[in-house]
Amino acid sequence: MRITLLDNFDSFTYNLVEQFCLLGAEVRVMRNDTPLPTIQAALLADGCELLVLSPGPGRPEDAGCMLELLAWARGRLPVLGVCLGHQALALAAGGAVGEARKPLHGKSTSLRFDQRHPLFDGIADLRVARYHSLVVSRLPEGFDCLADADGEIMAMADPRNRQLGLQFHPESILTTHGQRLLENALLWCGALAVRERLRA
């Protein structure tokens, strides 16, 4: 699988890259201050099969070209957003992002999750790493909530457009079954005929 990862200037970015490489993916990293046409041209040229939005500081609307890229990518190729990327997915699709009830930085918490969803295949118990003060406060139309912690959305998916958001950090050692989660995410996101959609 060919992945393009949009780097939102986060220290966890290359942890994600390493995990994807261990799963056999080819990963190219592009920063969010890269001009949008440059990223679009690269995605079209190399047959990218998944766009990944990294974690990062601040708010999604301040993260370079990320929201514009999402508007272009929607319906064209699958997207996986992690932490800030998860929030950007929601905002770009018409959802809302607000303050978390309690900021969490470097904390491991348990999740309540939908065990029927392929993201959680083979996972019975799950504790995840959380580094955030913002959450998705309103789910966008077309998205399903897959997991929550104390009523706050921790994972969501748009099955029609193959967009998946994780508020937590699967690449962190504080997350149990992190590599399995990423493998399941790749399998779920990779089910589209991506190249045909990119040409549309």
Swiss-Prot record:
CDD domains: GATase1_Anthranilate_Synthase. Keywords: Glutamine amidotransferase, Lyase, Virulence. GO terms for molecular function: anthranilate phosphoribosyltransferase activity; anthranilate synthase activity. Pfam families: GATase. Its EC number is 4.1.3.27. It is an enzyme of class 4 (lyase). Heterotetramer consisting of two non-identical subunits: a beta subunit (PhnB) and a large alpha subunit (PhnA). Pathway: Secondary metabolite biosynthesis; pyocyanine biosynthesis. The gene is phnB. The active site is at 83 (nucleophile), 169 (for gatase activity), 171 (for gatase activity). It catalyses: chorismate + L-glutamine = anthranilate + pyruvate + L-glutamate + H(+). Part of a heterotetrameric complex that catalyzes the two-step biosynthesis of anthranilate, a precursor for Pseudomonas quinolone signal (2-heptyl-3-hydroxy-4-quinolone; PQS) production which is required to induce the genes for the biosynthesis of the virulence factor pyocyanine (PCN), a characteristic blue-green phenazine pigment produced by P.aeruginosa. PhnAB is not feedback inhibited by tryptophan. L-glutamine binds at residues 56-58, 87, 133-134. It comes from Pseudomonas aeruginosa (strain ATCC 15692 / DSM 22644 / CIP 104116 / JCM 14847 / LMG 12228 / 1C / PRS 101 / PAO1). One of its GO terms (biological process) is phenazine biosynthetic process. This is Anthranilate synthase component 2, pyocyanine specific. PANTHER family: BIFUNCTIONAL PROTEIN TRPGD, MULTIFUNCTIONAL TRYPTOPHAN BIOSYNTHESIS PROTEIN-RELATED. It comes from the Bacteria.
